[in-house]
C-alpha cells in the first residue's frame, strides 16, 4: 500500500477579499475530490487574500498510480488561469515504512 500527498503553495490573481479567494479555492478543492477521488483541503495561508495552500492525499495499491494522480493534481491546478503555483511538495510512503 502506498500513501502519497502533495502540498501546493499558490498565488491568486486579482483577489482583494477572503470571500473572493474562497470562491476560487473551494471549486478547485471540490474538483480535486470529485475528479481524482482524493482527500483535499485548503491547508495554508487561510488569512491571506492572494495566497493559498492546497493539500491532497491518496492511498493506492501501487506506486505508479499514486505518482500518476499526484502529477494530474499538480497539472490541474497549474492550468487554472487565476492561480500561479509557487511551490509543490510531494511525499510518498509505503505501509512498510
Task: Describe the predicted segments one by one.
Residues 1-39:
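N-terminal first-folded block
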Residues 9, 42-46, 67-72:
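A general secondary-structure boundary signal
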Residues 60-97:
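C-terminal structural segments of small proteins and small subunits
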Residues 41-62:
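Short, charge-patterned binding micro-sites
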Residues 38-43, 86-87:
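A short linear hydrophobic-aromatic micro-motif
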Residues 6-10, 54-56, 88-90:
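A structural signal for short, well-ordered beta-strand segments
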Amino acid at each position: 500500500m502506498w500513501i502519497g500527498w502533495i502540498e501546493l503553495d499558490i498565488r491568486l490573481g486579482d483577489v482583494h477579499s477572503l470571500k473572493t479567494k474562497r470562491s476560487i479555492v473551494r471549486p478547485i478543492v471540490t474538483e480535486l475530490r470529485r475528479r481524482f477521488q482524493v482527500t483535499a483541503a485548503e491547508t495554508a495561508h487561510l488569512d491571506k487574500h492572494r495566497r493559498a495552500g492546497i493539500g491532497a492525499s491518496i492511498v493506492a495499491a501501487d506506486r505508479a498510480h499514486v505518482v500518476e494522480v499526484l502529477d494530474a493534481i499538480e497539472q490541474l491546478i497549474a492550468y487554472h488561469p487565476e492561480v500561479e503555483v509557487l511551490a509543490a511538495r510531494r511525499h510518498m510512503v509505503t505501509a512498510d515504512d
